[in-house]
């Protein structure tokens, strides 16, 4: 395969369905190179995200799927009567594909745009999170649910089912059909299958139904009373329709074939059918293929504002602008709004400031949970998505779910101005026009397609923050739905090959596998539809927020504030910036809560007109991106973007010309912004009365001197780096005091004045006691590691012998005590390998 811009294979499958995977495995075992292009985040979504398990069949299809059946049984995914646990289908399939990683490439989050016949076969253009790519192959197979390139699958769909999981509050056997009501469209039936405890609920819709109307109908039905009267509480709802189709696979004579992905009710049969399909590829054909390229985009209409991406920021932006009177068109690739807070599996808020429209959404979600919905942790996943969609519906925003951004429309008279977007759904390609667009796709899909200049990951190696795989479960004992996440390394979500490799590896292993859910207490709900990506490319804005800029930013320029720590989810500190290392590594201030101002200019891309960013794709450097991504702040960011769009539309001007004063006044009136908020660094103290309330920047000289002699000197050390309230001469004199010696040495080093502290720092490096400060509540580092960081900051060559002793001895830190204690300050140090790693990378840095 070639990775210089064009990927080359023997076969390209547009669709990563179970049928496509079965065919790909058969072809790979014959030595062929195969590419699976899939718009979802993981393979087999037509069954896994549709909550569609079925039973192991007893026919030829099952025999062709023996490897898949073996994986499922090995994972405990098959019951004694042959029923398949749909939540383990994706892990099983991922393991099979990984075994053939040298011959099968899986490209997730990749949307085919066109297919062109060439002399040697086919050339397919596709987009992955806003970046266009090209792949070539001798043979092309359409294998996605709606046949995006061929366009003929929709006519074969006979029925759609939206499947959910409900808690049954009675012990009686629950099965059969529930009574309908006026909230459901004509012909929609509600059936229940189960034996008490938790049951499967199926809502049947006709073939024309879309996810937006279907989920709204389910919400109305559940809250209407009939559902709760049956003793049921809805706990989870599928993210894709389970589809009933009579489509047959077809082979054409020009190197194209159509593989029907959902001919069967179970994934095992579909996989086996794919194997059979591969065996028949060189058989009889029936002429030339139908249309195998994207047709002209159909018009989706003209609006005042387009919101691309209905995540934490986008959903609030759309609601805000629509309530202010704008005609809003919103598109979302998933099945519901809310992003990481719904489809991403993150139930609870992490720090941040309160205030804004999102509080209304949280209140509505809590109210939904009182009638017909199961209890959820935090502000909920299912109920929060339902609440946001209800708000979008009531304010008149036009919403399309299952829509992926594919391109942008440029103003014919101004090529730097965009006036619309192109997107793909199961019904084809569409174009919507508006003078203003909010890019709230998180990964800057619109900004990339529009040609915005981008900011990337950390400066040392370009890597982004770690991503997570989040799995959900239902606690049967307390009737509460919850989730857990597992960090799985770094990923480049714009490189489809890297994204595919990391996704499969993450799916194949993690907290959602093994014996964790084997007992009767928990019911596995599966991994969430969105990969837990924390960072991506960000626009280069008119203003860019950095740690230095935040410290000097006038308070009256801020439109909202983030409140969070610099949480990289990693321990490879030497690869981070010097500013980050000073805070986290040298001062052990991992959980220092920084109040970060965000200005209007951070939301406005430089050089591209008609575009506003909202979410974690706003203009910040990597350090600020570690913090400025939490849900409360991102929802505030969305509300600010919605107000900017309204003011720009009202005044007929570009977003960057909107009055800062009027914008701030509006946001203050909406409780998005509190005039009392300012840049600050709030640190941990042992006293609950002052914990995270004292600001490092406001410490006096006497307070700094006193704290340097305590067991929590970190805040005082950092204070010495940002002000001169305590002079260097005083710090040098304090080196003679054993109680403050370590803190004084670090304080001098953080100023770059290490000469007097050289011997103390080298002694700290050689100290193998493992002693650490209490400067943070959750994650502190040994004084030795902090001293290594200080030596690196100052270029202290005298420390090299001590550092080389650590680097050259792989077991140097094997017997260091005190770090294996179960304490709050060490709980992110997982085991002995972590300790060795911290010392090794500290010495390298």
Where are these regions (language model features)?
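Conserved N-terminal/central alpha/beta ligand/cofactor-binding core
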Residues: 3, 26, 32-33, 38-114, ...
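Core register positions within helices of long alpha-helical scaffolds
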Residues: 96, 718-722, 747-750, 790-793, ...
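Amphipathic alpha-helical scaffolding segments comprising HEAT/armadillo-like alpha-solenoid repeats
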Residues: 695-707, 722-736, 753-774, 796-825, ...
């Amino acid at each position: 395969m070639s990775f210089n811009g064009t990927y080359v294979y023997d076969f390209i499958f547009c669709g990563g369905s179970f049928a496509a995977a079965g065919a790909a495995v058969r072809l790979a075992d014959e030595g062929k190179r195969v590419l699976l292009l899939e718009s979802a985040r993981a393979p087999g979504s037509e069954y896994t995200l549709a909550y569609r398990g079925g039973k192991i069949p007893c026919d030829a299809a099952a025999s062709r799927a023996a490897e898949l059946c073996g994986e499922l049984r090995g994972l405990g995914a098959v019951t004694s009567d042959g029923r398949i646990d749909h939540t383990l289908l994706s892990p099983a399939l991922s393991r099979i594909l990984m075994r053939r990683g040298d011959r099968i490439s899986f490209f997730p989050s990749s949307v085919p745009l066109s297919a062109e016949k060439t002399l040697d076969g086919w050339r397919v253009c596709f987009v992955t999170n806003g970046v266009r790519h090209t792949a070539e192959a001798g043979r092309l197979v359409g294998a996605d649910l709606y046949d995006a390139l061929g366009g003929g699958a929709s006519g074969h769909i006979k029925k759609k089912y939206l499947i959910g999981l409900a808690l049954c509050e009675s012990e009686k056997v629950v099965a059969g059909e529930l009574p309908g009501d006026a909230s459901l469209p004509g012909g929609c039936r509600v059936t229940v299958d189960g034996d008490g405890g938790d049951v499967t609920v199926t809502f049947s819709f006709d073939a024309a139904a879309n996810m937006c109307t279907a989920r709204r109908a389910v919400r109305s039905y559940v809250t209407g009373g009939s559902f709760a009267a049956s003793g049921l509480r809805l706990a989870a709802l599928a993210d894709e329709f389970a589809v009933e189709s009579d489509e047959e696979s077809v082979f054409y004579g020009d190197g194209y074939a159509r593989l029907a992905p959902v001919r069967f009710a179970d994934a095992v049969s579909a996989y086996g059918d794919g194997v059979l399909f591969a065996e028949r590829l060189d058989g009889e054909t029936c002429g030339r293929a139908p249309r195998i390229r994207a047709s002209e985009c159909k018009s989706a209409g003209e609006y005042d504002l387009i919101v691309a991406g209905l995540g934490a920021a986008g959903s609030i932006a759309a609601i805000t602008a629509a309530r202010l009177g704008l005609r809003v068109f919103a598109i979302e690739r998933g099945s519901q709004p809310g992003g990481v807070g719904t489809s991403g599996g993150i139930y609870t808020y992490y720090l941040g400031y309160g205030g804004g429209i999102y509080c209304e959404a949280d209140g509505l979600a809590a109210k939904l949970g009182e009638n017909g919905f199961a209890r959820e942790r935090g502000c909920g996943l299912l109920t929060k998505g339902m609440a946001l969609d209800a708000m979008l519906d009531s304010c008149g925003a036009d919403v399309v779910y299952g829509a992926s951004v594919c391109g942008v429309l440029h103003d014919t008279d101004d090529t730097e101005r965009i006036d619309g977007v192109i997107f793909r759904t199961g019904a084809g390609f569409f174009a919507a026009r508006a003078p203003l667009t909010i890019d709230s796709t998180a990964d800057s899909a619109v900004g990339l397609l529009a040609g915005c200049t981008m900011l990337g990951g950390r400066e040392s190696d370009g890597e982004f923050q770690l991503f997570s795989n989040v799995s959900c479960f239902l606690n049967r004992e307390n009737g509460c739905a919850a989730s857990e996440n597992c960090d799985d390394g770094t990923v480049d979500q714009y490189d489809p090959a890297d994204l595919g490799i990391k996704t499969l590896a993450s799916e194949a292993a993690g907290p959602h596998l093994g014996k964790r859910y084997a007992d009767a207490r928990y019911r596995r709900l599966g991994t969430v539809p969105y990969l837990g990506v924390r960072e991506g490319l960000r626009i280069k804005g008119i203003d860019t927020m950095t740690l230095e800029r935040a410290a000097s930013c006038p308070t009256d320029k801020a439109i909202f504030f983030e409140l969070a720590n610099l949480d990289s989810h990693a321990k490879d500190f030497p690869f981070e910036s010097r500013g980050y290392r000073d805070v986290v590594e040298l001062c052990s201030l991992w959980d220092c809560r920084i109040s970060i101002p965000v200005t209007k200019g951070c939301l406005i891309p430089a050089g591209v007109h008609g575009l506003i960013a909202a979410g974690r794709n706003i203009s910040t450097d990597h350090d600020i991106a570690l913090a400025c991504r939490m849900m409360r702040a991102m929802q505030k960011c969305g509300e600010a973007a919605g107000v900017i769009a309204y003011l720009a539309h009202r005044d007929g001007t570009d977003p960057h010309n909107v009055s800062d004063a009027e914008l701030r006044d509006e946001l203050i009136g909406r409780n998005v912004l509190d005039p009392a908020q300012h840049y600050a660094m709030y640190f941990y103290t042992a006293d609950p009365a002052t914990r995270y309330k004292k600001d490092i920047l406001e410490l006096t000289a006497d307070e700094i001197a006193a704290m340097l002699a305590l067991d929590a000197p970190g805040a005082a050390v950092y204070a010495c780096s940002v002000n001169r309230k305590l002079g260097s001469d005083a710090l040098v004199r304090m080196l003679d005091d054993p109680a403050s010696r370590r803190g004084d040495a670090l304080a001098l080093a953080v100023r770059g004045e290490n000469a007097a502290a050289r011997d103390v720092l080298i002694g700290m490096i050689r100290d193998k006691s493992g002693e650490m400060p209490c400067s943070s509540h959750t994650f502190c580092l040994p004084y030795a590691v902090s001293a290594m960081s200080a030596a690196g900051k100052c270029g202290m060559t005298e420390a090299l012998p001590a550092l080389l002793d650590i680097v050259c001895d792989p077991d140097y830190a094997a017997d260091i005590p005190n770090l294996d204690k179960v304490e709050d300050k060490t709980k992110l140090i997982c085991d002995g390998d972590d300790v060795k790693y911290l010392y090794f990378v500290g010495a390298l840095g």
